Amino acid sequence: MSPPSSMCSPVPLLAAASGQNRMTQGQHFLQKV
């Protein structure tokens, strides 16, 4: 479930956080529409 960007990311925690943030933003966007 981890995005490919997490592989090149030096900090896995940062990658996971950014992934969650992206998912939350997508959900908010869907809710807006």
Curated annotation (Swiss-Prot):
Organ and tissue specificity: Expressed in testis and melanoma cell lines.
The name of this protein is Putative tumor antigen NA88-A
Q: Which organism encodes this protein?
A: Homo sapiens (Human)
Which gene carries the instructions for this protein?
Answer: VENTXP1
